[in-house]
Amino acid sequence: MDDRLEKIAKVNYWNGNRFDSGVERTWYLDRIIPYTGNRVIKVVTGQRRAGKSWLMRQVMASMLKNGVMDPSQILYVNKEFYRFSFLHTTDDLMDLYETYCREINPDKKSYVFFDEVHNIPGWERVIDSLSQDPSIDCEVFLTGSNSKMLSGELSTLLSGRYIEFEVQPFSYREYLRTVHSSPSRSTMLDYLQSGGLPEFINLRGEETKRHYVESVKDTILLRDIVERYNIKDAALLNSIFAYLVNNGTSLVSVSNVVNYLNNEQSRRNPKAKEKNYETVSNYIGYLTDAFVILKADRYDLKGKEILKGAAKFYANDNSYHNYLFDGFGFGQGALLESYVYQAVRRAGWKVYVGRVQNKEVDFVCTDHDNRLYVQSSWTIEDEETAEREYSALESIDDSYPKIVVTMDDIARKNRNGILNIQAWNLEDYLVKLSARYNIIQG
């Protein structure tokens, strides 16, 4: 066998190898599997450590189990693994594929799974060739940790011949399956504290957990952003990340961030050069491209349009709040709001923040002609808080679903058609609503 194939055989299925594929992520499998069996490229994106590689293994396992292919038909390439360090150029990549076809799978269709292969310059043309060359019988799956992998040359080459699936950290329901528990206020409190990074959940000891979250953050910032964009000021990037994570429930503009950074800098070093708007704006864009920060634009309910300027920015996982920035006052209500945003977005909605008659609507959620309006409040047991949350939704003059999500032990009765959903029941509600509106969940 070719030396390169011997190196990578241990992470492939050719010799009867079987691999642990973790907690089955049925939401994503139910979306991806129906798109198999054709030349459409399946692209799995999402932040690092969200479980993309595990999901790829689950897709392979599902297809093997259902007899779609046999082990020799799979070629798995993970550019993050040292055993693939011989891959430097597109010629290396194509030569590996051709050698695999010659020695392992000469007669049947190939299913090629590329993990983080976008680190090879010019990789787009290899993907285009494998998926479109009529002399090659091949189906391609990709993962990537940056939303921009689908822009530029790849988008031009493929021109609609791909479908993207964004993977997020474990949902609350997936978390429950991992810890073998059931929905309750207690388990929701645990989830709000831990977040949903798959490998984090089984860690023990607060210091171990903190170090893990720190390493995930550093890897994303340094490898997916600093190295990719040749950033000179990694400390500035980290400061912007910290600011956005800890202001997730407030409207934030680029100017807000610039002013904060310059004020902090002038206290420490009055002679230092001020941060400029363009640099800060670019860095914020890099953070959202890497999926570690999620952006919720403002939506004008009266004019029915997306507004430019200030927006809300949420961390992609609550562990960033809880294990990296102890010095910031990030309360329970903010953790719940972050979770609600993540859950609704994961359920397939486009999520915005809105106002109506000078009242704040936490989330305006859209999917084509469908709408969902959501308020998030830790408790509405006192009448003043309940009035604030309900009155904003009552000011919206349409018949789309409206809900208030809380952590209250006892849910309030419906008020003018507005439901009070306890946080631990939110995802079940969203599943039913998505089925009603035929929304594809993420």
What name fits each language-model region?
Residues 409-442:
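Domain-level recognition of nuclease-like catalytic cores that cleave nucleotide substrates
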Residues 1-38, 285, 442:
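A short, basic N-terminal segment
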Residues 44:
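Hydrophobic anchor at the beta1->P-loop junction of P-loop NTPases
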Residues 76-107:
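Short glycine-rich substrate-engagement loop in P-loop NTPases that contacts/grips substrate
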Residues 73, 205-370:
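Accessory nucleic acid-recognition modules appended to NTPase machines
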Residues 53:
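Walker A/P-loop
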Residues 124-141:
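Conserved catalytic/switch belt of AAA+ P-loop NTPases
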Residues 2-8, 145-147, 151-251, 255:
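Interdomain motor-coupling "hinge/lid" segment immediately C-terminal to the ATP-binding subdomain
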